[in-house]
Protein backbone atom coordinates (compact mmCIF):
# COMPACT_ATOMS: atom_id res chain seq x y z
CA UNK A 1 0.00 0.00 0.00
CA UNK A 2 3.17 2.19 -0.06
CA UNK A 3 2.44 3.45 3.46
CA UNK A 4 6.07 2.73 4.39
CA UNK A 5 7.57 3.73 1.03
CA UNK A 6 7.72 7.47 0.51
CA UNK A 7 4.45 9.41 0.27
CA UNK A 8 1.40 7.67 1.65
CA UNK A 9 -1.31 6.60 -0.75
CA UNK A 10 -3.79 8.46 1.42
CA UNK A 11 -2.09 11.74 0.52
CA UNK A 12 -3.35 11.44 -3.06
CA UNK A 13 -6.93 11.21 -1.75
CA UNK A 14 -6.46 14.18 0.60
CA UNK A 15 -4.78 16.26 -2.10
CA UNK A 16 -7.59 15.52 -4.55
CA UNK A 17 -10.13 16.67 -1.96
CA UNK A 18 -8.13 19.87 -1.34
CA UNK A 19 -8.03 20.51 -5.09
CA UNK A 20 -11.82 20.20 -5.30
CA UNK A 21 -12.18 22.61 -2.38
CA UNK A 22 -10.04 25.21 -4.17
CA UNK A 23 -11.97 24.59 -7.37
CA UNK A 24 -15.26 25.25 -5.57
CA UNK A 25 -14.12 28.76 -4.62
CA UNK A 26 -13.82 29.76 -8.28
CA UNK A 27 -14.65 26.95 -10.73
CA UNK A 28 -13.86 29.10 -13.79
CA UNK A 29 -10.27 29.80 -12.67
CA UNK A 30 -7.91 27.91 -14.99
CA UNK A 31 -5.37 27.43 -12.17
CA UNK A 32 -7.98 25.64 -10.07
CA UNK A 33 -9.06 23.62 -13.09
CA UNK A 34 -5.47 22.60 -13.78
CA UNK A 35 -5.08 21.56 -10.15
CA UNK A 36 -8.09 19.24 -10.50
CA UNK A 37 -6.53 17.60 -13.56
CA UNK A 38 -3.13 17.18 -11.88
CA UNK A 39 -4.46 15.74 -8.62
CA UNK A 40 -6.91 13.48 -10.46
CA UNK A 41 -4.05 12.09 -12.55
CA UNK A 42 -1.96 11.61 -9.40
CA UNK A 43 -4.84 9.84 -7.67
CA UNK A 44 -5.35 7.43 -10.58
CA UNK A 45 -1.60 6.82 -10.85
CA UNK A 46 -1.37 5.94 -7.15
CA UNK A 47 -4.43 3.67 -7.39
CA UNK A 48 -3.06 1.89 -10.44
CA UNK A 49 0.37 1.53 -8.83
CA UNK A 50 -1.00 -0.08 -5.67
CA UNK A 51 -3.27 -2.33 -7.71
CA UNK A 52 -0.42 -3.25 -10.06
CA UNK A 53 1.89 -4.04 -7.12
CA UNK A 54 -0.71 -6.46 -5.76
CA UNK A 55 -0.96 -8.05 -9.21
CA UNK A 56 2.82 -8.48 -9.28
CA UNK A 57 2.63 -10.11 -5.86
CA UNK A 58 0.09 -12.57 -7.26
CA UNK A 59 2.33 -13.20 -10.27
CA UNK A 60 5.26 -13.95 -7.96
CA UNK A 61 3.17 -16.49 -6.06
CA UNK A 62 2.03 -17.90 -9.40
CA UNK A 63 5.64 -18.60 -10.39
CA UNK A 64 6.20 -20.31 -7.04
CA UNK A 65 3.20 -22.54 -7.80
CA UNK A 66 4.79 -23.62 -11.09
CA UNK A 67 8.14 -24.23 -9.40
CA UNK A 68 6.52 -26.38 -6.72
CA UNK A 69 4.56 -28.43 -9.25
CA UNK A 70 7.76 -29.01 -11.23
CA UNK A 71 9.52 -30.07 -8.04
CA UNK A 72 6.67 -32.41 -7.04
CA UNK A 73 6.87 -34.13 -10.44
CA UNK A 74 10.65 -34.40 -10.09
CA UNK A 75 10.30 -35.93 -6.62
CA UNK A 76 7.75 -38.42 -7.94
CA UNK A 77 10.13 -39.56 -10.68
CA UNK A 78 12.99 -39.95 -8.19
CA UNK A 79 10.85 -41.94 -5.74
CA UNK A 80 9.76 -44.23 -8.58
CA UNK A 81 13.40 -44.79 -9.59
CA UNK A 82 14.44 -45.44 -5.97
CA UNK A 83 11.57 -47.92 -5.60
CA UNK A 84 12.99 -49.97 -8.45
CA UNK A 85 16.52 -49.73 -7.04
CA UNK A 86 15.38 -50.86 -3.58
CA UNK A 87 13.41 -53.76 -5.02
CA UNK A 88 16.41 -54.88 -7.05
CA UNK A 89 18.83 -54.66 -4.10
CA UNK A 90 16.57 -56.37 -1.58
CA UNK A 91 15.07 -59.00 -3.89
CA UNK A 92 17.56 -61.65 -2.70
CA UNK A 93 16.58 -61.19 0.92
CA UNK A 94 20.21 -60.64 1.98
CA UNK A 95 21.04 -56.96 1.50
CA UNK A 96 19.18 -53.86 2.71
CA UNK A 97 19.30 -50.75 0.50
CA UNK A 98 19.81 -48.35 3.39
CA UNK A 99 21.23 -45.46 1.33
CA UNK A 100 18.41 -45.65 -1.21
CA UNK A 101 15.84 -45.95 1.56
CA UNK A 102 17.24 -42.90 3.34
CA UNK A 103 17.12 -40.92 0.09
CA UNK A 104 13.55 -42.05 -0.58
CA UNK A 105 12.45 -41.20 2.97
CA UNK A 106 13.93 -37.73 2.59
CA UNK A 107 12.03 -37.19 -0.68
CA UNK A 108 8.77 -38.42 0.86
CA UNK A 109 9.29 -35.99 3.75
CA UNK A 110 9.78 -33.13 1.28
CA UNK A 111 6.74 -34.20 -0.74
CA UNK A 112 4.60 -34.20 2.41
CA UNK A 113 5.41 -30.51 2.82
CA UNK A 114 3.90 -29.68 -0.57
CA UNK A 115 0.60 -31.56 -0.37
CA UNK A 116 -1.41 -34.14 1.55
CA UNK A 117 -0.01 -37.60 0.81
CA UNK A 118 -0.56 -41.22 1.78
CA UNK A 119 2.42 -43.59 1.46
CA UNK A 120 2.22 -47.37 1.73
CA UNK A 121 5.14 -49.81 1.43
CA UNK A 122 4.59 -53.40 0.32
CA UNK A 123 6.58 -56.52 1.18
CA UNK A 124 9.02 -55.94 -1.69
CA UNK A 125 10.00 -52.49 -0.39
CA UNK A 126 8.02 -50.62 -3.08
CA UNK A 127 6.24 -47.47 -1.85
CA UNK A 128 3.02 -46.37 -3.54
CA UNK A 129 1.94 -42.78 -2.94
CA UNK A 130 -1.40 -41.03 -3.20
CA UNK A 131 -1.34 -37.24 -3.47
CA UNK A 132 -4.54 -35.38 -2.56
CA UNK A 133 -6.42 -38.67 -2.84
CA UNK A 134 -5.20 -39.57 -6.35
CA UNK A 135 -2.58 -42.10 -7.42
CA UNK A 136 0.76 -40.34 -7.80
CA UNK A 137 3.49 -43.00 -7.65
CA UNK A 138 2.09 -46.24 -9.05
CA UNK A 139 3.52 -49.67 -9.87
CA UNK A 140 4.69 -48.74 -13.33
CA UNK A 141 4.99 -44.94 -13.39
CA UNK A 142 4.59 -41.59 -11.69
CA UNK A 143 1.50 -39.62 -12.72
CA UNK A 144 2.67 -36.06 -13.29
CA UNK A 145 0.65 -33.00 -12.29
CA UNK A 146 -0.24 -30.74 -15.21
CA UNK A 147 -0.83 -26.98 -15.26
CA UNK A 148 -3.61 -25.01 -16.94
CA UNK A 149 -2.58 -21.41 -17.69
CA UNK A 150 -5.29 -18.75 -17.89
CA UNK A 151 -5.19 -16.07 -20.55
CA UNK A 152 -5.01 -12.55 -19.20
CA UNK A 153 -3.79 -13.37 -15.70
CA UNK A 154 -1.41 -16.23 -16.54
CA UNK A 155 -2.58 -17.99 -13.36
CA UNK A 156 -1.72 -21.70 -13.16
CA UNK A 157 -4.17 -24.35 -11.98
CA UNK A 158 -2.76 -27.83 -11.14
CA UNK A 159 -4.75 -30.73 -12.58
CA UNK A 160 -4.41 -34.48 -13.27
CA UNK A 161 -3.83 -35.03 -17.02
CA UNK A 162 -4.10 -38.83 -16.72
CA UNK A 163 -7.72 -38.70 -15.54
CA UNK A 164 -8.87 -35.47 -17.22
CA UNK A 165 -11.09 -35.90 -20.26
CA UNK A 166 -13.12 -33.59 -22.46
CA UNK A 167 -16.13 -34.42 -20.30
CA UNK A 168 -14.42 -34.21 -16.92
CA UNK A 169 -11.73 -31.81 -15.68
CA UNK A 170 -9.88 -33.10 -12.60
CA UNK A 171 -8.11 -30.37 -10.59
CA UNK A 172 -5.59 -31.57 -8.01
CA UNK A 173 -7.39 -29.64 -5.27
CA UNK A 174 -11.16 -30.04 -5.18
CA UNK A 175 -11.51 -27.57 -2.29
CA UNK A 176 -9.84 -24.54 -3.92
CA UNK A 177 -11.78 -22.17 -6.18
CA UNK A 178 -10.91 -22.26 -9.88
CA UNK A 179 -10.46 -19.12 -12.01
CA UNK A 180 -13.94 -18.15 -13.19
CA UNK A 181 -13.04 -18.44 -16.89
CA UNK A 182 -11.65 -21.95 -16.36
CA UNK A 183 -14.61 -23.02 -14.24
CA UNK A 184 -17.00 -21.83 -16.94
CA UNK A 185 -14.96 -23.44 -19.70
CA UNK A 186 -14.74 -26.90 -18.13
CA UNK A 187 -18.05 -26.81 -16.28
CA UNK A 188 -16.40 -27.43 -12.93
CA UNK A 189 -17.73 -25.12 -10.22
CA UNK A 190 -16.07 -25.31 -6.81
CA UNK A 191 -15.39 -22.90 -3.97
CA UNK A 192 -12.56 -22.58 -1.48
CA UNK A 193 -13.49 -24.52 1.63
CA UNK A 194 -10.45 -25.16 3.80
CA UNK A 195 -10.40 -25.65 7.56
CA UNK A 196 -8.44 -27.50 10.22
CA UNK A 197 -11.62 -29.31 11.21
CA UNK A 198 -11.84 -30.73 7.68
CA UNK A 199 -8.21 -31.87 7.81
CA UNK A 200 -7.55 -30.27 4.43
CA UNK A 201 -5.34 -27.33 5.43
CA UNK A 202 -2.23 -29.26 4.43
CA UNK A 203 0.66 -28.45 2.11
CA UNK A 204 2.43 -25.36 0.82
CA UNK A 205 1.13 -25.78 -2.76
CA UNK A 206 -2.47 -25.41 -1.64
CA UNK A 207 -1.44 -22.49 0.59
CA UNK A 208 0.10 -20.72 -2.41
CA UNK A 209 -3.02 -21.28 -4.52
CA UNK A 210 -5.24 -19.85 -1.79
CA UNK A 211 -2.87 -16.92 -1.16
CA UNK A 212 -2.68 -16.02 -4.84
CA UNK A 213 -6.42 -16.25 -5.38
CA UNK A 214 -8.30 -17.32 -8.47
CA UNK A 215 -8.15 -13.96 -10.29
CA UNK A 216 -7.68 -10.22 -9.82
CA UNK A 217 -9.99 -8.57 -7.31
CA UNK A 218 -12.33 -5.94 -8.77
CA UNK A 219 -15.02 -3.66 -7.33
CA UNK A 220 -17.86 -6.05 -8.18
CA UNK A 221 -16.53 -8.55 -5.61
CA UNK A 222 -17.62 -6.14 -2.89
CA UNK A 223 -21.29 -6.85 -3.56
CA UNK A 224 -23.16 -9.03 -1.10
CA UNK A 225 -23.58 -11.89 -3.56
CA UNK A 226 -19.90 -11.97 -4.61
CA UNK A 227 -18.04 -11.01 -1.43
CA UNK A 228 -17.60 -14.61 -0.27
CA UNK A 229 -15.23 -15.17 -3.21
CA UNK A 230 -12.66 -12.71 -1.80
CA UNK A 231 -13.50 -12.74 1.91
CA UNK A 232 -10.75 -15.21 2.81
CA UNK A 233 -8.13 -13.89 0.38
CA UNK A 234 -6.25 -10.82 1.60
CA UNK A 235 -4.76 -9.90 -1.78
CA UNK A 236 -7.97 -10.19 -3.81
CA UNK A 237 -9.98 -8.43 -1.10
CA UNK A 238 -7.53 -5.52 -0.93
CA UNK A 239 -7.56 -5.22 -4.73
CA UNK A 240 -11.35 -5.19 -4.69
CA UNK A 241 -11.40 -2.54 -1.95
CA UNK A 242 -8.99 -0.23 -3.79
CA UNK A 243 -10.94 -0.76 -7.02
CA UNK A 244 -14.22 -0.06 -5.22
CA UNK A 245 -12.91 3.15 -3.62
CA UNK A 246 -11.50 4.47 -6.90
CA UNK A 247 -14.70 3.63 -8.75
CA UNK A 248 -16.93 5.40 -6.23
CA UNK A 249 -14.83 8.57 -6.34
CA UNK A 250 -14.80 8.53 -10.15
CA UNK A 251 -18.54 7.89 -10.44
CA UNK A 252 -19.42 10.55 -7.85
CA UNK A 253 -17.40 13.28 -9.58
CA UNK A 254 -18.61 12.32 -13.06
CA UNK A 255 -22.23 12.39 -11.91
CA UNK A 256 -21.72 15.96 -10.66
CA UNK A 257 -20.13 17.24 -13.87
CA UNK A 258 -22.38 15.14 -16.13
CA UNK A 259 -25.63 14.43 -14.25
CA UNK A 260 -28.05 11.87 -15.64
CA UNK A 261 -31.79 11.42 -15.51
CA UNK A 262 -34.23 8.96 -17.05
CA UNK A 263 -36.62 9.34 -19.95
CA UNK A 264 -39.44 6.94 -20.80
CA UNK A 265 -40.21 6.87 -24.51
CA UNK A 266 -43.66 6.53 -26.01
CA UNK A 267 -43.04 2.83 -26.65
CA UNK A 268 -42.35 2.27 -22.93
CA UNK A 269 -38.57 2.00 -23.22
CA UNK A 270 -36.69 3.76 -20.41
CA UNK A 271 -33.40 5.48 -21.24
CA UNK A 272 -30.71 6.96 -19.01
CA UNK A 273 -29.90 10.33 -20.55
CA UNK A 274 -27.97 13.51 -19.81
CA UNK A 275 -29.90 15.89 -17.56
CA UNK A 276 -29.56 18.81 -19.96
CA UNK A 277 -31.70 21.05 -17.74
CA UNK A 278 -29.30 20.87 -14.80
CA UNK A 279 -25.88 20.06 -16.25
CA UNK A 280 -22.92 22.42 -16.40
CA UNK A 281 -20.94 23.14 -19.55
CA UNK A 282 -17.41 24.12 -20.46
CA UNK A 283 -16.24 27.51 -21.66
CA UNK A 284 -17.40 26.65 -25.20
CA UNK A 285 -20.96 26.05 -23.95
CA UNK A 286 -21.38 22.86 -25.99
CA UNK A 287 -23.27 19.70 -25.04
CA UNK A 288 -22.72 17.10 -23.83
CA UNK A 289 -20.27 18.23 -21.12
CA UNK A 290 -17.00 16.36 -20.65
CA UNK A 291 -16.72 13.90 -17.78
CA UNK A 292 -13.61 14.11 -15.59
CA UNK A 293 -12.79 10.39 -15.57
CA UNK A 294 -13.24 8.82 -19.00
CA UNK A 295 -13.27 5.21 -20.13
CA UNK A 296 -10.60 4.67 -22.77
CA UNK A 297 -12.17 4.32 -26.21
CA UNK A 298 -15.69 4.56 -24.78
CA UNK A 299 -17.72 7.79 -24.87
CA UNK A 300 -20.06 8.69 -22.02
CA UNK A 301 -22.98 9.59 -24.32
CA UNK A 302 -24.42 8.76 -27.71
CA UNK A 303 -26.68 11.34 -29.35
CA UNK A 304 -30.03 9.83 -30.33
CA UNK A 305 -33.41 11.00 -31.56
CA UNK A 306 -36.25 9.65 -29.39
CA UNK A 307 -39.87 10.62 -29.94
CA UNK A 308 -38.72 13.34 -32.32
CA UNK A 309 -36.39 14.95 -29.75
CA UNK A 310 -32.61 14.87 -29.37
CA UNK A 311 -31.14 13.13 -26.32
CA UNK A 312 -27.67 12.25 -25.11
CA UNK A 313 -28.11 8.63 -24.07
CA UNK A 314 -25.73 7.33 -21.43
CA UNK A 315 -23.51 4.46 -22.59
CA UNK A 316 -23.96 2.16 -19.63
CA UNK A 317 -21.57 -0.52 -18.42
CA UNK A 318 -22.18 -4.00 -19.81
CA UNK A 319 -20.78 -7.39 -18.87
CA UNK A 320 -20.30 -8.20 -22.54
CA UNK A 321 -17.89 -5.28 -22.99
CA UNK A 322 -15.10 -5.09 -20.43
CA UNK A 323 -13.92 -1.70 -21.68
CA UNK A 324 -17.29 -0.18 -20.73
CA UNK A 325 -16.55 -0.49 -17.00
CA UNK A 326 -15.41 2.39 -14.81
CA UNK A 327 -12.57 0.49 -13.19
CA UNK A 328 -8.83 0.80 -12.69
CA UNK A 329 -6.97 0.11 -15.90
CA UNK A 330 -9.92 1.21 -18.04
CA UNK A 331 -10.15 4.82 -16.90
CA UNK A 332 -7.94 7.88 -17.25
CA UNK A 333 -8.41 11.60 -16.78
CA UNK A 334 -10.37 12.81 -19.79
CA UNK A 335 -7.69 13.63 -22.40
CA UNK A 336 -9.84 16.45 -23.82
CA UNK A 337 -9.88 18.18 -20.43
CA UNK A 338 -6.16 17.55 -19.94
CA UNK A 339 -5.50 19.20 -23.30
CA UNK A 340 -7.86 22.16 -22.69
CA UNK A 341 -8.89 22.66 -19.06
CA UNK A 342 -11.40 25.39 -19.94
CA UNK A 343 -13.67 22.63 -21.29
CA UNK A 344 -14.25 21.46 -17.71
CA UNK A 345 -18.00 21.81 -16.95
CA UNK A 346 -17.73 24.85 -14.68
CA UNK A 347 -20.37 27.16 -16.15
CA UNK A 348 -24.11 27.35 -16.11
CA UNK A 349 -25.70 27.24 -19.52
CA UNK A 350 -26.29 31.00 -19.33
CA UNK A 351 -22.50 31.50 -19.24
CA UNK A 352 -22.14 32.36 -15.52
CA UNK A 353 -19.91 30.44 -13.11
CA UNK A 354 -21.63 27.50 -11.46
CA UNK A 355 -20.72 28.00 -7.81
CA UNK A 356 -23.29 25.39 -6.85
CA UNK A 357 -20.76 22.74 -7.88
CA UNK A 358 -18.89 23.35 -4.62
CA UNK A 359 -21.85 22.26 -2.50
CA UNK A 360 -22.46 19.20 -4.67
CA UNK A 361 -18.81 18.13 -4.44
CA UNK A 362 -18.69 18.69 -0.67
CA UNK A 363 -21.85 16.64 -0.13
CA UNK A 364 -20.59 13.81 -2.34
CA UNK A 365 -17.15 13.75 -0.68
CA UNK A 366 -18.36 13.88 2.90
CA UNK A 367 -21.38 11.59 2.42
CA UNK A 368 -21.05 8.54 4.64
CA UNK A 369 -22.60 5.89 2.43
CA UNK A 370 -19.79 3.35 1.99
CA UNK A 371 -19.23 0.06 3.79
CA UNK A 372 -15.80 -1.60 3.82
CA UNK A 373 -17.58 -4.87 2.99
CA UNK A 374 -21.12 -6.29 3.17
CA UNK A 375 -20.52 -7.41 6.76
CA UNK A 376 -19.57 -3.92 7.94
CA UNK A 377 -22.14 -2.09 10.06
CA UNK A 378 -20.77 1.47 10.09
CA UNK A 379 -20.81 3.71 7.03
CA UNK A 380 -17.95 6.03 6.10
CA UNK A 381 -16.90 8.59 3.50
CA UNK A 382 -14.10 8.26 0.94
CA UNK A 383 -11.20 9.04 3.29
CA UNK A 384 -12.75 6.98 6.07
CA UNK A 385 -13.04 4.06 3.66
CA UNK A 386 -9.30 4.09 3.03
CA UNK A 387 -8.62 4.23 6.77
CA UNK A 388 -10.77 1.13 7.13
CA UNK A 389 -8.82 -0.65 4.39
CA UNK A 390 -5.55 -0.08 6.27
CA UNK A 391 -7.09 -1.04 9.62
CA UNK A 392 -8.62 -4.20 8.16
CA UNK A 393 -5.36 -5.14 6.46
CA UNK A 394 -3.33 -4.51 9.61
CA UNK A 395 -5.68 -6.57 11.78
CA UNK A 396 -5.57 -9.50 9.38
CA UNK A 397 -1.79 -9.26 9.15
CA UNK A 398 -1.43 -9.33 12.94
CA UNK A 399 -3.71 -12.36 13.23
CA UNK A 400 -1.94 -14.27 10.47
CA UNK A 401 1.52 -13.47 11.86
CA UNK A 402 0.57 -14.68 15.35
CA UNK A 403 -0.93 -17.84 13.86
CA UNK A 404 2.16 -18.40 11.71
CA UNK A 405 4.53 -17.96 14.66
CA UNK A 406 2.54 -20.43 16.75
CA UNK A 407 2.40 -23.06 14.02
CA UNK A 408 6.08 -22.62 13.17
CA UNK A 409 7.02 -23.16 16.82
CA UNK A 410 4.78 -26.23 17.07
CA UNK A 411 6.14 -27.71 13.83
CA UNK A 412 9.74 -27.18 15.00
CA UNK A 413 9.04 -28.91 18.33
CA UNK A 414 7.41 -31.90 16.62
CA UNK A 415 10.23 -32.13 14.08
CA UNK A 416 12.84 -32.11 16.86
CA UNK A 417 11.07 -34.97 18.64
CA UNK A 418 10.80 -36.89 15.40
CA UNK A 419 14.46 -36.42 14.53
CA UNK A 420 15.50 -37.86 17.88
CA UNK A 421 14.33 -41.18 16.48
CA UNK A 422 14.03 -40.92 12.70
CA UNK A 423 17.01 -38.63 12.26
CA UNK A 424 19.49 -41.15 13.67
CA UNK A 425 21.73 -42.86 11.11
CA UNK A 426 21.75 -46.65 11.57
CA UNK A 427 25.28 -46.89 10.13
CA UNK A 428 26.54 -44.26 12.57
CA UNK A 429 24.89 -45.97 15.52
CA UNK A 430 26.28 -49.36 14.47
CA UNK A 431 29.76 -47.87 14.26
CA UNK A 432 29.37 -46.46 17.77
CA UNK A 433 28.15 -49.81 19.08
CA UNK A 434 31.16 -51.62 17.62
CA UNK A 435 33.48 -48.95 19.01
CA UNK A 436 31.95 -49.18 22.47
CA UNK A 437 32.00 -52.98 22.36
CA UNK A 438 35.70 -52.97 21.46
CA UNK A 439 36.41 -50.55 24.28
CA UNK A 440 34.49 -52.77 26.70
CA UNK A 441 36.42 -55.84 25.58
CA UNK A 442 39.75 -54.05 25.99
CA UNK A 443 38.81 -52.82 29.45
CA UNK A 444 37.69 -56.30 30.43
CA UNK A 445 40.99 -57.84 29.33
CA UNK A 446 42.95 -55.17 31.22
CA UNK A 447 41.05 -55.89 34.44
CA UNK A 448 41.57 -59.64 33.98
CA UNK A 449 45.34 -59.18 33.61
CA UNK A 450 45.54 -56.97 36.71
CA UNK A 451 43.49 -59.51 38.66
CA UNK A 452 45.79 -62.35 37.63
CA UNK A 453 48.92 -60.36 38.50
CA UNK A 454 47.52 -59.47 41.91
CA UNK A 455 46.66 -63.10 42.59
CA UNK A 456 50.18 -64.22 41.58
CA UNK A 457 51.86 -61.67 43.86
CA UNK A 458 49.73 -62.76 46.82
CA UNK A 459 50.63 -66.38 46.22
CA UNK A 460 54.36 -65.63 46.06
CA UNK A 461 54.25 -63.77 49.35
What are these regions (language model features)?
Residues 1-461:
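Structural signature of extracellular appendage/secretion-system components
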